[in-house]
A protein has these predicted regions:
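Intrinsically disordered, low-complexity, compositionally biased regions/tails
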Residues: 13-15, 25, 56, 61, ...
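Short, polar/charged, Gly/Pro-enriched helix-capping and turn/loop motifs at alpha-helix termini
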Residues: 54, 61-62, 154, 303
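N-terminal secretory signal peptides
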Residues: 1-46, 55-56
Length: 374
C-alpha cells in the first residue's frame, strides 16, 4: 500500500513557494510527506457542531454523523465560510505566518490564489499533524467536507484513503485575505484535491476559483472500466451522449488527441473551441447533456452547483458549450472515451481518465478571467 501511495505522489512535481513579506511569511515546501495508511479514523466533532451552530445561526450535524452506519446520507453539513473565520481567529501569530497570505499574494507563477495543480501543497503543515490543535483539526475537517454534498462524503473519504492514506494525511490548507471581510479565500490542497471557498469574494468565479479532483482507485494505471473509481460514473454519462450522436455529430465531437490537461484557460475566441456544439444537438441529446452537467456538479454543495449554473447562463447557456471526446488514451481500445472535455466561452471541465482520473475545472461568468494551471 505504501509503495502504491508513494508511486502516486509522482503525478506531478511539487510546487516551490517563496517567502512573502511581513507580517505573513511562508517557507518553501518540504519534501514529499510520508504516508500513514491507517484505517479510516473519525475524530470528535462536538466543538465544531457547537461553534458552527452559534456562528451560522442554525444548528447542524457534524460530519461524524454523516458517516455513521445506518444514518441517511442527506443530513446537512456545516457551511464552510463561517467556520473559516472562526478557524482564522483561532490561529496563533506563528500559525498564521505559515498558512496565511495577503489577498493578492503572488509567487513566481503569479496570483497564488488563482493557481491550480494536480498534486501540490501550498503550505507545509499537514492537517493531521501536531501543528494544529484538536479543535482546529475538527474545524478544518468540517470546512473541507462542507464543500461537498453530504451524499458524497463517503466517496470523498474513499478517494482520500486510496490516494493519500486517508483524510488529512497529505492535505494542507491556506487562507488568503481576512475571513469575515469581502476578500478572503480558504484553499485545501493535496494529491488529487484542490477545493476552495470564499463567500463570493471572487464574484465572477464558480467554486471561488479553479478546482481539481481525481482518483486512482486500484492502481496508477487503471483498467478500462476503472473499478472503484468514485468519479468514473461522470465519464459513463458523457459516453452515453456519444452513443446517441449520429455520424456527422460524432465526426465533429471526436478529436484525435487531447490537449495538455493543464490547458484550462479560457480561449480568446469561442471559435477556437473544438468539438460538437451543444446547440447543434437534438432535443433528446440536449437533455442527456443536462444529465452530464448534473453529474459533474453533483459532488459539490448546493450553493456551488447554483453558481455553476449561473455562470453558464451568463455565457448563453449550455448551448454555447462544446463537447469533445479524445481518441488518445482510450484504455482497452473499447471506444469508451476515457478523455473528454466540456468547454464554453468561460467554462472548462476537462476530464482526463487515462491512466487514472484527473479532472480540471475552471468556470466564470467572464471569459476574460485569468488563472494559472501547471
Amino acid at each position: 500500500m505504501i509503495d502504491k501511495l508513494i508511486a502516486h505522489r509522482l503525478d506531478s512535481p511539487l510546487l516551490s513557494l517563496t517567502k512573502i513579506g511581513v507580517p505573513m511569511e511562508l517557507n518553501s515546501l518540504s519534501p514529499l510527506h510520508s504516508f500513514t495508511p491507517n484505517s479510516l479514523q473519525i475524530s470528535r466533532r462536538h466543538f465544531v457542531r457547537t461553534v458552527g451552530a452559534a456562528i451560522a445561526g442554525t444548528p447542524f450535524l457534524g460530519t461524524n454523523q454523516l458517516l455513521t452506519a445506518g444514518q441517511p446520507e442527506s443530513i446537512p453539513s456545516a457551511i464552510p465560510e463561517p467556520l473559516v473565520k472562526k478557524l482564522y481567529e483561532s490561529f496563533t501569530p506563528a500559525q498564521k505566518s505559515k498558512v496565511c497570505f495577503n489577498w493578492d499574494h503572488k509567487d513566481k507563477h503569479g496570483l497564488l490564489r488563482q493557481h491550480i495543480r494536480a498534486n501540490w501543497n501550498i503550505t507545509e503543515p499537514i492537517v493531521n499533524s501536531d501543528y494544529f490543535t484538536k479543535d482546529q483539526k475538527e474545524m478544518i475537517e468540517a470546512i473541507f467536507f462542507g464543500h461537498f454534498d453530504p451524499s458524497w462524503h463517503k466517496k470523498i473519504r474513499k478517494q482520500l484513503q486510496d490516494d493519500q492514506g486517508g483524510y488529512g494525511e497529505d492535505q494542507s490548507i491556506a487562507i488568503f485575505g481576512t475571513p469575515g471581510t469581502n476578500q478572503f479565500q480558504f484553499v485545501m490542497t493535496g494529491r488529487h484535491t484542490t477545493v476552495r471557498c470564499d463567500g463570493d469574494s471572487a464574484e465572477h468565479l464558480a467554486f471561488g476559483g479553479p478546482i481539481f479532483y481525481g482518483h486512482a482507485a486500484d492502481d496508477f494505471n487503471e483498467k478500462a472500466n476503472h473499478p472503484g473509481n468514485v468519479f468514473w460514473e461522470q465519464a459513463i454519462k458523457a459516453n452515453q451522449v456519444y452513443k446517441i450522436l449520429d455520424g456527422k455529430q460524432r465526426q465533429a465531437a471526436l478529436i484525435p488527441a487531447a490537449p495538455a490537461e493543464t490547458k484550462i484557460q479560457f480561449k480568446k475566441s469561442a471559435n477556437d473551441i473544438t468539438g460538437l456544439q451543444i446547440s447543434e444537438m437534438t432535443k433528446d441529446q440536449k437533455q442527456e447533456m443536462q444529465k452530464v452537467l448534473s453529474s459533474l456538479i453533483e459532488p459539490f454543495r448546493t450553493s456551488d452547483q447554483t453558481e455553476v449554473r449561473k455562470c453558464i447562463k451568463a455565457q448563453g447557456g449550455l448551448d454555447q458549450c462544446r463537447i469533445s471526446f479524445y481518441q488518445s488514451g482510450d484504455i482497452g481500445n473499447d471506444q469508451v472515451w476515457d478523455n473528454w472535455r466540456l468547454e464554453g466561452p468561460a467554462f472548462v471541465w476537462h476530464y482526463r481518465g487515462a491512466p487514472h482520473v484527473h479532472v480540471w475545472v475552471n468556470i466564470s461568468d467572464d471569459p476574460h478571467t485569468q488563472i494559472i494551471a501547471s
